[in-house]
Amino acid sequence: MLLFVGLGNPTPDSENNRHNIGFKLIDALNQKFGLSKQKPKFKGLLTTGNVEDKKVYAIKPLTFMNNSGICIRELIEYFKIDAEDVIVFHDDLDLEFGKVKAKFAGSSAGHNGIESIDKFIGKDYSRVRIGIGRPKTKADVADHVLKDFDEDEMIQLEKITKNIIDSMAILIDKKLDLFSSTVNNK
């Protein structure tokens, strides 16, 4: 059993923000694999089903980015999911736009959603970092992550999302380096 988590903020005006790339991945996963209708549970929107013959849960926390860990802890305790079986999709400033890097454990690199999850379940889970690039000045970081993708970026994002979803079998097997290189080289 696996838990996929997409990080984002739950307001309608945040839908196309760079910070909401995790939500977009969960939506694509739900659509591609025909997971159940999203239901409000565990302070998030929860779906369930099978991906590559593996039972999965997928959630978009409704607690806002900085409190995502609360939702995740409740869910893994209820379903008795090990932290090692959690895979989190999130934006990453330190990766070039469109690049993907999957890894197990490690630091939050200043990402508040990851810091919250670390606080509530520890660091031993997988992360799929999706590059949104860094703004030119440090002062612009908050504006950058909360800004909508532009039209060209949305087109690229569709391709990136498709590559990630098409490579799910590799991710489910937790071959994280192979997953990253496969997605980045499609």
UniProtKB/Swiss-Prot annotation:
The keyword Cytoplasm applies. CDD domains: PTH. Keywords: Cytoplasm, Hydrolase, RNA-binding, tRNA-binding. InterPro entries: Pept_tRNA_hydro, Pept_tRNA_hydro_sf. The record marks 9 as: Discriminates between blocked and unblocked aminoacyl-tRNA. GO terms for molecular function: peptidyl-tRNA hydrolase activity; tRNA binding. It catalyses: an N-acyl-L-alpha-aminoacyl-tRNA + H2O = an N-acyl-L-amino acid + a tRNA + H(+). It is an enzyme of class 3 (hydrolase). TRNA binds at residues 64, 66, 112. The record marks 91 as: Stabilizes the basic form of H active site to accept a proton. GO terms for biological process: protein quality control for misfolded or incompletely synthesized proteins; rescue of stalled ribosome. The active site is at residue 19. Belongs to the PTH family. Monomer. This is Peptidyl-tRNA hydrolase. It comes from Pelagibacter ubique (strain HTCC1062).
